[in-house]
Amino acid sequence: RGFWLLVMGFYVCGFQIQFINNHLENYLDGTIVGGAMAATAIALIGLFNMFGTQTAGVIGDKLRKKYLLANLYMARSVIFLIFFIVPVSKVSVIIFACSVGFLWLATVPLTSGIVAQIFGPRYLATLYGVVFLSHQLGSFTSVWLGGIIRTQTGSYDYAWYMIIVAGFVAALLHWPIDEQPIVRPVAAS
């Protein structure tokens, strides 16, 4: 059960980050800062991602990964919500990009760490591949739905609501995950 909760949570990771990656420019183009500011934002996201991912890996060695993931998804949604309700300016875009960048792929060492911790290194590649597939499906879904929402309504408002709510749902999904390693019987000689 915990594995499938992790799969669903990582779906949300892809769902959130690819919406930003693919629709931020168009979203900002409709504001006073213009779409060109999105290039700066994506660059800052990439820069802060390096530090956030490294930090998550280090902290994940010391604290329970499932709780770190739950808090990470919740923090992302809070950042998205604040960015969505605060008037857009160059300063708000820079603060948003740095904040969300720090959390951008910080999910990866924690998610792969849970898979390794539960199933062991022998099954890590295959099982993390399944988890990563869900990330890609989430990516596709948010990019596609974001485009449909923008086309149908002329606004990204409902898409922002979607990624915000999805993050809170992902936070809840991680709480019941059992991180204990699976005990396998030792084969007799």
Which functions belong to the PLM regions below?
Residues 1-58, 108, 142:
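Extracytoplasmic gate region of multi-pass secondary transporters
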Residues 3, 65, 121-125:
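Cytoplasm-facing, short amphipathic helices at loop-to-helix transitions on the intracellular side
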Residues 12, 44, 48, 75, ...:
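Small/hydrophobic positions within alpha-helical transmembrane segments
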Residues 19, 43-49, 53-114:
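C-terminal transmembrane helical hairpin of 12-TM major facilitator-type secondary transporters
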Residues 28-29, 59-60, 145-154:
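Interfacial helix-cap and linker-helix signal at transmembrane-aqueous boundaries
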Residues 35-36, 121-130:
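Loop-to-transmembrane helix entry/capping segments in MFS-fold secondary transporters
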Residues 115-124, 154:
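Paired intracellular helix-loop junctions of major facilitator superfamily
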Residues 164-189:
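Multi-pass alpha-helical transporter architecture, strongest
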